[in-house]
């Protein structure tokens, strides 16, 4: 732990915190600490300077010795020995990770804060055109020590938000100027930060808001504006939904591949005006009459149909990819988690048979949670049916099949046609597994390593061929089809 010496003063005129600091010996090291940006001579000279009192703070100017470029690293876990304008000494302990602020022997500091808060409020009221600027006008409203402390707490919270600013004049040849706000680094680590401080046995707690109210407010805001924004599941940044399609559903903040609906994937891969859907009127008839206590299967199907505008969890058809005729099937995770029922299996099987008869290359985009439990063993049989059709397509007809694994691809889809492609392509960070992490851990009583079911880890194990981002995906597929003798229709 390092010791930092501060000369600090709260200016009465504008309520700003101005400072000078220098680094003294480390508590663990007997030798002097070298500061590459500050010379020892400057430190010695500055320590001998007089400290201006708060009475002439408006006209005083400070020669700031050392600037701070990264305040988070500067006060991540340090103790500061501070001397105020009255030459009273006290210490401040910062621990940003645990969100702790401790003040010792800080009577004069708190009184100076109090005075500064009044000055700050007067200054603000003058700027806002307030009629009253009497520093003692509100003091009598707080007739108990507890009320006054609460008022100080609120003022301190507001003060940290709006006023406490370290203006650091960094000594260098170019005489650069930088400004950093304390609050952004102390309190922005958590949206509901708590700064705990203790002064001679009394506890001073500053809370922006309680965790419960904060989380409930966030939930309300998310629900209210979810039609406008999509939250990234990786960095939790917000993406404007209107622009997502043009950006290929890539997070603007971190580039993470967000879930993409089947219609937009078709627009991404298929040339405009060439898409011809197949069997889009095929719907499930509830073959085993599955009725749950919450909602009957038929009602659930109707609900997803009205919500997504699709009849089932897969869209199949033909089109052109850079002029190359292809047969393509795209699964949609928004329709019952992309689960594979009898209709999904039948549509994919018919697509494969059509591609075999027309000698078309086949492209299947997988996004599924597995077999659909509401259809029992009939959904499991789709795995064998699709695999059988693919065997004829690949082995007997010698045609080219490419499967694309997106997030998530799990269960029966992984165990059947998802892993049968001549070329298996995965999207970055895609979740690919047979059984989910929780199922494995509860069944085998073993911990599944973090990230062991993601595309990058599985790629190292040889589970599929390339990992291709969405931006170059269409070009990569076009090159693969050209390599296998599939050429555009308009090429002589």
From Swiss-Prot:
Kindly list the biological process annotations in GO that this record carries.
fatty acid biosynthetic process; malonyl-CoA biosynthetic process
Task: Give the record's cofactor note, including how many are bound.
Answer: Binds 1 zinc ion per subunit.
| Keywords per UniProt | ATP-binding, Chloroplast, Fatty acid biosynthesis, Fatty acid metabolism, Lipid biosynthesis, Lipid metabolism, Metal-binding, Nucleotide-binding, Plastid, Transferase, Zinc, Zinc-finger
* InterPro entries (UniProt xref): AcCoA_carboxyl_beta (IPR034733), Acetyl_CoA_COase_Trfase_b_su (IPR000438), ClpP/crotonase-like_dom_sf (IPR029045), COA_CT_N (IPR011762)
The CoA carboxyltransferase N-terminal domain covers 228-492
Q: How does it assemble?
A: Acetyl-CoA carboxylase is a heterohexamer composed of biotin carboxyl carrier protein, biotin carboxylase and 2 subunits each of ACCase subunit alpha and ACCase plastid-coded subunit beta (accD).
Which NCBIfam families does this chain map to? Answer: accD
Q: What is this protein called?
A: Acetyl-coenzyme A carboxylase carboxyl transferase subunit beta, chloroplastic
According to its UniProt entry, this protein's organism is Citrus sinensis
């Amino acid at each position: 732990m390092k010791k930092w010496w501060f000369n600090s003063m709260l200016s009465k005129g504008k309520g700003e915190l101005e400072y000078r600091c220098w680094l003294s010996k480390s508590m663990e090291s007997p030798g002097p600490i070298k500061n590459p940006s500050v010379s020892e001579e400057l430190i010695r000279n500055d320590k001998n300077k007089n400290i201006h009192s708060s009475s002439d703070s408006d006209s005083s100017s400070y020669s700031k010795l050392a600037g701070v470029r990264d305040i988070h690293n500067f006060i991540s876990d340090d103790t500061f020995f501070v001397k105020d304008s009255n030459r009273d000494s006290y210490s401040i302990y910062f621990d940003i990770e645990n969100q702790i602020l401790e003040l010792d022997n800080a009577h004069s500091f708190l009184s100076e804060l109090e005075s500064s808060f009044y000055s700050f409020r007067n200054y603000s009221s003058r700027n806002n055109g307030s009629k009253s600027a009497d520093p003692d006008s509100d003091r009598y409203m707080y007739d108990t020590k507890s009320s006054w402390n609460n008022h100080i707490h609120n003022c301190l919270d507001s003060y940290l938000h709006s006023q406490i600013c370290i203006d650091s004049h960094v000594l260098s040849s170019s005489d650069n100027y930088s400004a950093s706000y304390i609050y952004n680094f102390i309190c922005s680590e958590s949206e509901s930060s708590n700064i705990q401080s203790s002064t001679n046995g009394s506890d001073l707690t500053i809370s922006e808001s309680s965790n419960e109210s904060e989380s409930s407010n966030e939930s309300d805001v998310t629900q209210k504006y979810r039609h406008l924004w999509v939250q990234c599941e990786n960095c939790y940044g917000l993406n404007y939904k209107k622009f997502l399609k043009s950006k290929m559903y890539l997070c603007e903040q971190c580039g993470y591949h967000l879930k993409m609906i089947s219609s937009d994937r078709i627009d991404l891969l298929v040339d405009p005006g060439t898409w011809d859907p197949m069997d889009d009127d095929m719907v499930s008839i509830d073959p085993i009459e599955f009725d749950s206590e919450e909602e009957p299967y038929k009602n659930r199907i109707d609900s997803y149909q009205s919500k997504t505008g699709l009849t089932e969890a897969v869209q199949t058809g033909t089109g052109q990819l850079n002029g190359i005729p292809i047969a393509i099937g795209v699964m949609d995770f928004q329709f019952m988690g992309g689960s594979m029922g009898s209709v999904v299996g039948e549509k994919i099987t018919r697509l494969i048979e059509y591609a075999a008869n027309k000698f078309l290359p086949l492209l299947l985009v997988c996004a599924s949670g597995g077999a659909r439990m509401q259809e029992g063993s009939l959904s499991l049989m789709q795995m064998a049916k699709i695999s059988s059709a693919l065997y004829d397509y690949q082995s007997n007809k010698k045609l080219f099949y490419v499967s694309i694994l997106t997030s998530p691809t799990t269960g029966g889809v992984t165990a059947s046609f998802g892993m049968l492609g001549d070329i298996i392509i995965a999207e970055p960070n895609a979740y690919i597994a047979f059984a989910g992490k929780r199922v494995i851990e509860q069944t085998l009583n073993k911990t599944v390593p973090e990230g062991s079911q993601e595309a990058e880890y599985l790629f190292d194990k040889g589970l599929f061929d390339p990992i291709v981002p969405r931006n170059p995906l269409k070009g990569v597929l076009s090159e693969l089809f050209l390599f296998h003798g599939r050429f555009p229709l308009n090429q002589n």
